[in-house]
Amino acid sequence: MKQSTIALALLPLLFTPVTKARTPEMPVLENRAAQGDITAPGGARRLTGDQTAALRDSLSDKPAKNIILLIGDGMGDSEITAARNYAEGAGGFFKGIDALPLTGQYTHYALNKKTGKPDYVTDSAASATAWSTGVKTYNGALGVDIHEKDHPTILEMAKAAGLATGNVSTAELQDATPAALVAHVTSRKCYGPSATSEKCPGNALEKGGKGSITEQLLNARADVTLGGGAKTFAETATAGEWQGKTLREQAQARGYQLVSDAASLNSVTEANQQKPLLGLFADGNMPVRWLGPKATYHGNIDKPAVTCTPNPQRNDSVPTLAQMTDKAIELLSKNEKGFFLQVEGASIDKQDHAANPCGQIGETVDLDEAVQRALEFAKKEGNTLVIVTADHAHASQIVAPDTKAPGLTQALNTKDGAVMVMSYGNSEEDSQEHTGSQLRIAAYGPHAANVVGLTDQTDLFYTMKAALGLK
């Protein structure tokens, strides 16, 4: 069916005056598992009835009190499908990612810095800048346009309006997606003072700039910041008020509550501007959920299919993405004005780069559990916009079991008891590359209808800004 036909079909729903969404369970929208035996006629159907009324009931144009934005880094349709096939089966569904009632697709190109023309394959920095500021920029830039001009982020605007703010990631907190909310630098590589002096000197404190990503993160002072990246906090400030002190010492002196494991995170009962929370759970990126062999040349033919195994480094001392999401919501929801929270499942992308299907799939399952927590809160609270999307598409493909692919492959045993082959073949280098196909965006709650149809990544900024009534 053409997109124009779908859009026309939705027009009566989108223009029906609705001021308040109904909150009872809507199984026709939320339960999308196959109805029965997939070998029987109708058994693979996911619809249990007409969804027109349920879609209408899900619409709301009232202001949102809270927004929870969940990003699957590198989570294109292929990554979602592969994870669903493996973990839930072909007829299964994700209770978070697949349960949001309103779905669309968005474009996500970057810009060439010199020409201003489209760069059809974005990186995470330009991508996150697009939804956090509403401005297209060049690959590698954070919080600035192609002319290197700063633009305020949705987190900065929410904080200025008195809302609580949160920034959660399984990556280093200096990595592109979390950094885009709090930093304005000409290169995403400027994690700490030393790298900033070398790679983006105009941003360095000694040159009158705003400092490194980590220094700007501390200045942004989100109420809750959770992730990896502890290593950079050991660097010493080379200029400014905190010159000679490590960034960790600076955080402590400025009143941050520092936690480093699941138990200490669990013990925190409040986080606000007087006592912001900074959780650093790894020197670099946080450990992934599942392990398995990387794809190799003709790996699906020369090697047996495998089942992914738990990562022993992801023990009980390491909070999961769902646990970090839960704690962030618990703490931020104490602000009567509301909150903005971004949650990133970062290593879908990183494991896709590494051609590691088990790593990639496990991180997608992790994100789904975080989405479930966000939806549970939103349905109970009644005034929260939940959005789930990605920053860019990626390299993995599902191919036939006997394919002699020119790239790297690995066979997996799925929940169905069948074999699924993952293929990675868009780079001869050690790292696979991003791709430029449009991405899924789905939402629940006030203003969720604005993700329907074809939008651009920058539209997400304006949708969130309008939903929260930010100026």
From Swiss-Prot:
Gene Ontology terms: biological process: protein dephosphorylation
Keyword Protein transport on entry: no
Signal peptide limits: 1-21
UniProt cross-references to SUPFAM superfamilies, sorted A to Z: Alkaline phosphatase-like
GO molecular function list: alkaline phosphatase activity; hydrogenase (acceptor) activity; magnesium ion binding; oxidoreductase activity, acting on phosphorus or arsenic in donors; phosphoprotein phosphatase activity; zinc ion binding
Keywords: Disulfide bond, Hydrolase, Magnesium, Metal-binding, Periplasm, Phosphoprotein, Signal, Zinc
Cofactor: binding comment: Binds 1 Mg(2+) ion. Binds 2 Zn(2+) ions.
PANTHER family assigned to the protein according to its UniProt record, in alphabetical order: ALKALINE PHOSPHATASE
Cysteine pairings via disulfide bonds: C190-C200, C308-C358
Gene name as annotated: phoA
Binding locations of Zn(2+) 1: D349, H353, H434
Record: residues binding Zn(2+) 2: D73, D391, H392
PROSITE patterns documented for this protein: ALKALINE_PHOSPHATASE
Quaternary structure (record): Isozymes 1 and 3 are a dimer of identical chains, isozyme 2 is a dimer of heterogeneous chains, one of each of the subunits from isozymes 1 and 3.
Record-listed E.C. numbers: 3.1.3.1
Entry-linked CDD domains: ALP (cd16012)
GO cellular-component term (any): outer membrane-bounded periplasmic space
Active site location: S124 (phosphoserine intermediate)
Residues that coordinate or bind Mg(2+): D73, D175, T177, E344
Cofactors, names only: Mg(2+); Zn(2+)
Entry's family note: Belongs to the alkaline phosphatase family.
Intracellular or extracellular location(s): Periplasm
Name of the protein in question: Alkaline phosphatase
Reactions it catalyzes: a phosphate monoester + H2O = an alcohol + phosphate
